[in-house]
Amino acid sequence: MLATDSDPIVAIATAAGRGGIGVVRVSFGRGGEAAALPLIDALCGQRLAPRHASYVPFVDEHGAPLDRGIALYFPAPHSYTGEHVLELQGHGGPIVMQLLLQRCLDAGRGFGLRLAQPGEFTRRAFLNDKLDLAQAEAVADLIEASTEAAARSAGRSLDGAFSRQIHALVEDVITLRMLVEATLDFPEEEIDFLEAADARGKLAKIREQLAHVLGDARQGALLREGLSVVLAGQPNVGKSSLLNALAGAELAIVTPIAGTTRDKVAQTIQVEGIPLHIIDTAGLRETEDEVERIGIARTWSEIERADVVLHLLDSRTGMTADDEVIAARFPGGVPVVRVLNKTDLTGVPACVEHPAAAGDLTEVHLSAKRGDGIDMLRAELLRIAGWQAGAEGVYLARERHLIALRAAQEHLAQAADHAEQRAQSLDLFAEELRLAQEQLNAITGEFTSDDLLGVIFSRFCIGK
């Protein structure tokens, strides 16, 4: 049978493995109370008071107990999904959870109860107006947050901080659209009417607010995605030592033997709440060793995908001919920072040198062995990422949000151009406003394709 958004669904809502508590969640969809009450009777042997915790046995089809725990019944619309929902909180062993799940499926076979798909409970919450799309995505972002700052920002998005900003923009665009489109109906008055209502001034304020929202969203995207930083360079220049220094732990083997690192070593660290995904790679050189050559090929693949490349050099030799060959292969669109390591052997103080001319690279002089200059390097990485100190109060945002905000920004810029031409382009002015509104509505899901919804919710865990 084809799954639909109105089917009754069930899933284990807690993570796999053993724990003190495990939760099985049922959302009854079109079955409503007519399905919920018989299932509650079958599993719990008694009626449950709505929104009250009841300590009951969970029984099989013969009345024998499978477990004892807390049962919670939430009649619609006062539930997570907006439908009638039952939650069974039992002991968190995988066998117990599977027994409860199968018992629900068996008892609910008569009204079409099926296993939930990934993210289907949250999808129901979105479809039933319990959450908008940005808030629904924040549920997954909160679960997946890799830093405290990311978790707090996801919580703000879930609370509606991002959505409120978008809704305010949409309301302002709608108000301006109404003004412009009403003016189109009275062409003999269009110039005086628009000027009297200060249409261009209103548009300028909308664009200013959108730029502010986009700036905050960029900061939120950094909190969510972080920065991929690849350590690259010749063998034995201290890449593994730098990874260990940045991470504050001995993660990579460090020896004076060239070619010790043959495959990547990755570690995520936090700097001001931003996850930095540091990747130590095989030293770049010509070699006949087949295993090392595979590692070097993987290094170049990582460099192609990097957000930032740290090109490590030995400060005793500086930029050699071999280093020039390596630098020439770096992809043009990836920022590169030249890191001169081993200043403990040269006596050069740790420092950051920003480029004096276009085309030059930032240079960081440091000692990974002693830790000199490591904080300077962290600060430089945050600067490249565009992180603003104190921005941890922003909401979390995704790449699709940034794309929509930039598209709306472009449409509003086009609208401003048409507004300057007055009557000759008034219909185009109105159309650009409509397109900007459409992009903003896509963020909260008021205008969203079914295909996009499928992609978003398929990335959730089952049971959420």
Curated annotation (Swiss-Prot):
Binding residues for GTP: 236-241, 255-261, 280-283
Gene name of the record: mnmE
Top-rank taxon: Bacteria
Amino acids binding Mg(2+): S240, T261
Protein name: tRNA modification GTPase MnmE
Pfam families recorded: MMR_HSR1, MnmE_helical, TrmE_N
Cofactor: binding comment: Binds 1 potassium ion per subunit.
Recorded family membership: Belongs to the TRAFAC class TrmE-Era-EngA-EngB-Septin-like GTPase superfamily. TrmE GTPase family.
E.C. code: 3.6.-.-
Localization terms from the record: Cytoplasm
Segments passing through the bilayer: none
Binding site for (6S)-5-formyl-5,6,7,8-tetrahydrofolate: R25, E87, K130, K464
Organism: Burkholderia ambifaria (strain ATCC BAA-244 / DSM 16087 / CCUG 44356 / LMG 19182 / AMMD)
Cofactor dependence: K(+)
Any one GO BP annotation for this protein: tRNA wobble uridine modification
Domain TrmE-type G: 226-386
